[in-house]
Amino acid sequence: MLRVGPGSLAITGGSRLLGHRVGSECCPFHLDCSLLEKQSAAPGQEGSADSHGSDKILAAAFSPSGEYFALTDDNKRLVLFRTKPAWEKISVRWVSRRCTALTFSPCGNHILVADKSGDVFSFSVPRALEQGRLELGHLSMLLDVTVSLDGKHIITCDRDEKIRVSCWGAPHVIMSFCLGHTEFVSQLLPLPGQEKLLLSGSGDGTLRLWEYESGKEVHSVTLRSLAHELEDQENKRFAVSRISCCSCNGIQLAVLCEGVPGIFLFSVSPEPRLTFTQYIALTHTPIDLDFDGSAFLWVLSGVREEPLLKYKELDDQWQSVSNDEELTRLTGIIQENWGDLEGAGAPESRFVGLYKAVFDNMATYLQKKELRLESEKRKAADGQVVLASKVQKTES
């Protein structure tokens, strides 16, 4: 996992976190979640409350200011860090279920975590030891959570194709549903500007642009139709696994799809519409990507020889950056810690079991019908043989 915040960069792999202050000559910050405290057992139980967790980091995010960083792991920890002036761990708290997504509020005072049971909890940042508060719940597994840029709405998506826009502070007031995806919704991203636009990505291989307050779909793009350079298209579903946005020069978007060795790049036009600008083909399937505040696109490749890639838009084309001092320094740091990072988090499918099962009822019906007709034909033939035998006996 790769996350880039103002002045900092974080890479996770397995249970390990590597934090770095951009431009700093200091040694990077290391943390192994498996060495953190375990949750106390409930009364009457022995050992930890959950001894089956792997300590693998599941979700992470920087605060908007970059001053804080938070992560959750497979042992239900929520760990908060301060990144300025140097990285340090502030607190370890506990969530009730394993989390699928994490985000900060626009003001940076709250962390919102979404879990597999469909609930969203908020945790205070200033009061770093305070327990979480339940904000809202779904009846299905949540896959992402975000907050509108004005801080008024919590936006969630689940495995049942729904995007829900709820009022923060009054979650029983649902502003809208954004409906249109035909598979699970995996990514949400509010876009900067006055239009109150939301971008979503799904297992159906589409990106959709919404006016989220009304639930109106503004535009959609099918990613399969854009990857002309990609071989073996028919065996890929183009499930959207990551979206990142940069607003330094208009709105630029970078999109990853699970199992696709490349990056889709878009801009958002004033209409508004998603305008496809470029597909960057890579030799390996990238693990993650993120924009920094200077409009550079960072890509975590998962290849030890070149673990980190950096792109910049030049003459309306995204081009690889070479001879970059910061990139060289970070590449060396990642390579030195490659074993600890477990290959910087070799990609595992997040979406196994989320696709809708397809049952071909018509084929089953036709097969049963054919068997029934054959059975009736056999019975009719047997009946004719018996009748002929009776006639012969009567004549004799």
From Swiss-Prot:
Pathway: tRNA modification; N(7)-methylguanine-tRNA biosynthesis
GO BP field: tRNA (guanine-N7)-methylation; tRNA modification
Alphabetized UniProt keyword annotations: Nucleus, Repeat, tRNA processing, WD repeat
GO cellular component: cytosol; nucleus; tRNA (m7G46) methyltransferase complex; tRNA methyltransferase complex
Gene Ontology MF, one: enzyme activator activity
The keyword Nucleus belongs to this UniProt entry's keyword annotation: yes
Annotated InterPro entries: Trm82, WD40/YVTN_repeat-like_dom_sf, WD40_repeat_dom_sf, WD40_rpt
Keyword Lyase: no
Family of the protein in this entry: Belongs to the WD repeat TRM82 family.
Subunit text: Non-catalytic component of the METTL1-WDR4 complex, composed of mettl1 and wdr4.
Record's function text: Non-catalytic component of the METTL1-WDR4 methyltransferase complex required for the formation of N(7)-methylguanine in a subset of RNA species, such as tRNAs, mRNAs and microRNAs (miRNAs). In the METTL1-WDR4 methyltransferase complex, wdr4 acts as a scaffold for tRNA-binding. Required for the formation of N(7)-methylguanine at position 46 (m7G46) in a large subset of tRNAs that contain the 5'-RAGGU-3' motif within the variable loop. M7G46 interacts with C13-G22 in the D-loop to stabilize tRNA tertiary structure and protect tRNAs from decay.
Cross-referenced PANTHER family: TRNA (GUANINE-N(7)-)-METHYLTRANSFERASE NON-CATALYTIC SUBUNIT WDR4 (PTHR16288:SF0), WD40 REPEAT PROTEIN 4 (PTHR16288)
Protein's name according to its UniProt entry: tRNA (guanine-N(7)-)-methyltransferase non-catalytic subunit wdr4
Source organism per UniProt: Xenopus laevis
Lineage of the organism: Eukaryota, Metazoa, Chordata, Craniata, Vertebrata
